[in-house]
Each structure stands twice: as C-alpha cells, then as structure tokens.
Amino acid sequence: MTLPDFRLIRLLPLASLVLTACTLPGHKGPGKSPDSPQWRQHQQEVRHLNQYQTRGAFAYISDDQKVYARFFWQQTGQDRYRLLLTNPLGSTELELNAQPGNVQLVDNKGQRYTADDAEEMIGKLTGMPIPLNSLRQWILGLPGDATDYKLDDQYRLSEVNYHQDGKNWKVVYGGYDSKTQPAMPANMELSDGSQRIKLKMDNWIVK
C-alpha cells in the first residue's frame, strides 16, 4: 500500500529533559587499537546476547522538524525486535514489530502498515531517516558494517563514521552502563549534516 506522509506529534515538553540528558562529554586520552584482544573479547560478549531490552529518551532534530519521545527497544531473537515511541502521558505514538521478511507498524491513530524493510517504512511514515538497520548494531556498541571507528580507553566503541547511500553518519558515544555485563551504551548521538538523533538509555536488561 502507499505509505502516507505521517508525522509524530512534536513532544516539546520533553525538549529540555532530552537535550540535557543526552549531552555528550568529551573523550579523554588516546583511543585504543581496534585490533586489541580486549576489543575483540568485548565484541564477542555483546554478539552472544540473544535477548535484551532498553528504554530511555529519544530526540530527532533537523531543520524541518523536532521530535522528542520516550522509547522502548526489545530484541527477542535473531532479527526479531520491537520498538515503541511514547509521549509524556505514556500513550503510544508508534509501535514497530519486525521479524525476517515482515515488518508491521501501528501509528497513534491505530492505523496498521506492513512492509519488508523497517528502515524504509520508518522514513516514509515519520519523515525521520533513521538508519534503523545500522542502529540495531550501534545501540549495542558494535560498529556493524562500518570500518571507520574509534575505541575509548576501556576498549569500547567511542565513535563510528559510516558512509552509505549518500548519508554520512557519525555516531558518538557519551558513556557506558557498567552495571550490565558486558557494559552497554548509556547515551549516544547520531548526526548527518543538520540531522541529529539522540538516545539516552535509562537501563538495560540483557540475557
């Protein structure tokens, strides 16, 4: 079916909260080598996670629109995940359920859409070109298909530069949650030109 030009409501009351929470500190000292055994071990531990979930604050900022929301991300198996965006009252603005070959999205009016590519669907329905296919790796602190990246002094991902389909995404990590094992990202910012996507993870549950 033809996808309409749907827009999430602009959740302005959350603006100051999200922007403050997602301020990224500068990185200290030189980064570690991507060839280090500590980095390879960290990647292996993260990739062995079968199920995980996280929730927190989401912001999308561009010249055309600003969207602020709460998010909930749940991975239940290989290529099976669920993404919720909610407003300050807790009402669902967007729910996306993805599994191999089938993606379903329900908007805040209860309208249901189906497709086979979650990233393309999100872009068409919300006007936000979120690199969802890559974000699934980046949110875990993994570089995905990117080969240009840097590590922090704890052998964790600190920056990613990824070029694909005319987009030049830069991902900067502001910290990690060491209460989880392995340590998972606590906040991050994606940017491409004037577009910015900010995520602050309140907590992680990993299995």
Curated annotation (Swiss-Prot):
Protein's membrane topology: Lipid-anchor
Entry superkingdom: Bacteria
PROSITE patterns: PROKAR_LIPOPROTEIN (PS51257)
GO BP of this protein: lipoprotein localization to outer membrane; protein transport
Positions where lipid (N-palmitoyl cysteine) attaches: 22
Localisation: Cell outer membrane
Signal sequence, renumbered to the chain: 1-21
Keywords: Cell outer membrane, Chaperone, Lipoprotein, Membrane, Palmitate, Protein transport, Signal, Transport
Predominant localisation class: membrane
Keyword Heme part of the UniProt annotation: no
GO terms for cellular component: cell outer membrane
Lipid-substituted positions (S-diacylglycerol cysteine): 22
HAMAP family: LolB (MF_00233)
Subunit structure: Monomer.
Family recorded in the similarity comment: Belongs to the LolB family.
NCBIfam families linked to this entry: lolB (TIGR00548)
Function in brief: Plays a critical role in the incorporation of lipoproteins in the outer membrane after they are released by the LolA protein.
Protein name: Outer-membrane lipoprotein LolB
Organism: Salmonella typhi
